[in-house]
């Protein structure tokens, strides 16, 4: 199969999330875990981006002037707050329903986001490039992880960053992120995640480094039931985030 014929889209996953599109912005709905997860991932993105680009994370618009791609943006839970930080944000999702919800909410909120119903490969083929590519809670829902990561890496500008957040493929993750979260705690609808589609860190790092990027940070993320908050952790057995950077010099 030629690379041009490959696709990152798992239509079953697109259909699953399209069916829940109306609930994206409900903090008590089916996407409640993402609402809870947003503060820790936004802080991580802001701080690491500011460190890389020499910005003040405490300023009102620390990402001013940076072009950001939120791939698999869903209803825009991440795109909107990143845009509020001053970034010029493109939110991409293959689901027309998700993009419709995201666009309507952004307009009502007075936030400017360029939402597009497109795939990662369509953006890459069009020659789009970004200072930051956000790949958050997406890779476990795509059809071809290696091709997806390679495609996303192509869009990272020299000196730019790619953030990835997902769930590790471990028995601990199967017990906590799937069985407990979907069947006991009912945080997520059953079937949201499938064990065989979870992704180990090295399966992300390999295509990123092969694409000329350097892995600069790895962190686990865990939920503290006492504080009802997500926090960074050294434990990457369940939820984790990776950060990679392309050299400021053109290397290919």
UniProtKB/Swiss-Prot annotation:
S-adenosyl-L-methionine binds at residues 41, 72, 93, 136. The keyword Transferase applies. Signal peptide: none annotated. Pathway: Cofactor biosynthesis; ubiquinone biosynthesis. Its EC number is 2.1.1.222, 2.1.1.64. It is an enzyme of class 2 (transferase). It holds the Pfam family Methyltransf_23. It catalyses: a 3-demethylubiquinol + S-adenosyl-L-methionine = a ubiquinol + S-adenosyl-L-homocysteine + H(+); a 3-(all-trans-polyprenyl)benzene-1,2-diol + S-adenosyl-L-methionine = a 2-methoxy-6-(all-trans-polyprenyl)phenol + S-adenosyl-L-homocysteine + H(+). Keywords: Methyltransferase, S-adenosyl-L-methionine, Transferase, Ubiquinone biosynthesis. SUPFAM superfamilies: S-adenosyl-L-methionine-dependent methyltransferases. GO terms for biological process: methylation. GO terms for molecular function: 2-polyprenyl-6-hydroxyphenol methylase activity; 3-demethylubiquinol 3-O-methyltransferase activity; polyprenyldihydroxybenzoate methyltransferase activity. Belongs to the methyltransferase superfamily. UbiG/COQ3 family. O-methyltransferase that catalyzes the 2 O-methylation steps in the ubiquinone biosynthetic pathway. This is Ubiquinone biosynthesis O-methyltransferase. It comes from Rhizobium leguminosarum bv. trifolii (strain WSM2304). The lineage of its organism: Bacteria, Pseudomonadati, Pseudomonadota, Alphaproteobacteria, Hyphomicrobiales.
């Amino acid at each position: 199969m030629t690379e041009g014929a490959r696709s990152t889209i798992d239509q079953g996953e697109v259909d699953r999330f399209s069916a829940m599109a109306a609930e994206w912005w409900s903090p008590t709905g089916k996407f409640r875990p993402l609402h809870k997860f947003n503060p820790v991932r936004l802080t991580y993105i802001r701080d690491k981006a500011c460190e890389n680009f020499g910005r003040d994370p405490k300023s009102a618009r620390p990402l001013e002037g940076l072009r950001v791609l939120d791939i698999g943006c869903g209803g825009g839970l991440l795109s909107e707050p990143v845009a509020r930080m001053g970034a010029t944000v493109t939110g991409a999702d293959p689901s027309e329903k998700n993009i419709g919800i995201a666009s309507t909410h952004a307009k009502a909120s007075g936030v400017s986001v360029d939402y597009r119903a497109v795939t990662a490969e369509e953006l890459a083929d069009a020659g789009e490039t970004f200072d930051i590519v956000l790949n958050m809670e997406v890779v476990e829902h795509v059809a071809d992880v290696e091709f997806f990561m390679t495609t996303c890496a192509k869009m990272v500008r020299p000196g730019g960053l790619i953030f990835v957040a997902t769930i590790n493929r471990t028995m601990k993750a199967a017990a906590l992120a799937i069985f407990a979260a979907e069947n006991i705690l009912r945080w997520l609808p059953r079937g949201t995640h499938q064990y065989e589609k979870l992704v180990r860190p090295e399966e992300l790092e390999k295509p990123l480094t092969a694409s000329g990027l350097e892995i600069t940070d790895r962190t686990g993320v865990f939920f503290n039931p006492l504080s009802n908050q997500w926090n960074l952790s050294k434990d990457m057995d369940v939820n984790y985030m990776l950060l990679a950077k392309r050299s400021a010099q053109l290397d290919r």
